[in-house]
From Swiss-Prot:
Its EC number is 2.5.1.7. It is an enzyme of class 2 (transferase). HAMAP family: MurA. It holds the Pfam family EPSP_synthase. Keywords: Cell cycle, Cell division, Cell shape, Cell wall biogenesis/degradation, Cytoplasm, Peptidoglycan synthesis, Pyruvate, Transferase. It comes from Baumannia cicadellinicola subsp. Homalodisca coagulata. The keyword 4Fe-4S does not apply. Cell wall formation. Adds enolpyruvyl to UDP-N-acetylglucosamine. This is UDP-N-acetylglucosamine 1-carboxyvinyltransferase. InterPro entries: Enolpyruvate_Tfrase_dom, Enolpyruvate_Tfrase_sf, MurA_subfamily, RNA3'P_cycl/enolpyr_Trfase_a/b, UDP_GlcNAc_COvinyl_MurA.
Amino acid sequence: MDKFRIQGPTQLIGEVTIAGAKNSALPILFATLLAEEPVNIHNVPKLKDIDTAIQLISQLGAKVKYNKSVYVDASNIAVYCAPYDLVKTMRASIWALGPLVARFGQGQVSLPGGCAIGARPVDLHLDGLAKLGATITLEKGYVKAYIKGRLRGAHIVMDKVSVGATVTVMSAATLAQGITIIDNAALEPEIVDTANFLITLGANIIGAGSNQIIIDGVTSLGGGEYRVLPDRIETGTFLVAAAISRGHIVCHATRPNMLDAVIAKLRETGAKIETGEDWISLNIHGKRPKAITVRTAPYPGFPTDMQAQFSLLNLIAKGTSVITETIFENRFMHIPELMRMGVHAKIENNTIICHGVEKLSGAQVMATDLRASASLVLAGCIAEGVTIVDRIYHIDRGYDCIENKLRNLGANIERIYS
């Protein structure tokens, strides 16, 4: 497996262009299965998960061309089963099920894989499809959905806020007969982006971005062009990189209004942040950041996908702080690895007590999931000596050319190919 070798410490200074959002691009790619005409999707990030999604929809019979944009023609889908060999690496594969059963009356998806960060069951997805009229069964590791005729609109109240399940129900409901109301829907910008894509294809959706989404089903969806919104988590990751390295980074091609909670917390550290319509600048003027309290929450609260990066920030900051994770269990696997580099932390249930240290030491560490791997790479950039980050296939799942972008900011980082 590939590794990163990082020589630190480095003050990261410069400019970076933010890629398209993984958490928009993936549901949008799977939603192309609903379209009877070709679709062009722009600003798609170059990620391992994107490659997997493209392979999957190609195996189902879609014609796909992937260059700077992704062209999908799903007019001749002939296979309705997403196989284990692809699904095992990516939990997002469950998003194929809703479009398949909505358009073709049947679909099968192997129980999905992805990051090992606790219980993220697909029950909410399946409950939503069942309420739309689909018969759901589990056979030999595959989830199967079936219906005679069209799905039927329904009033669905989500038991808990779930981005993934909101996407599944919203996408499937676009082709259902009648009106579907989703209450307690997720509010994330990526939900709005997916809804806007579906609207481009001819769907009738109102309320995306609020806790109630209303979909008036249509008989078919056409084609169109769409541009994926910028990745707010990649943006936040590079802003943290500037803060922990006592540097200055400007992020371009992003949207500051999607990052209010992250920006507010970074300002608490003492960093100076400036924003424009499509850029954010963080300059901490060579100072050590101040420790801050962080509690993850569904959007518009502090994103769980930024928790690992802010854990690192607090562990090198001035003072003692507490980070509370409310979204996922078992999402502190980066902490034992950071301890190998000299941090002082104590895990108590769903909280981390962080005692900031002034310096980190390079070490050999192992990535355990996507966002944890980002925190380890950033730690290597500011640690004294050499850091080796193993199992970086995790970071390739969610960050577009991260080593090139860090290198352009001054990091001494190289990929060691296996």
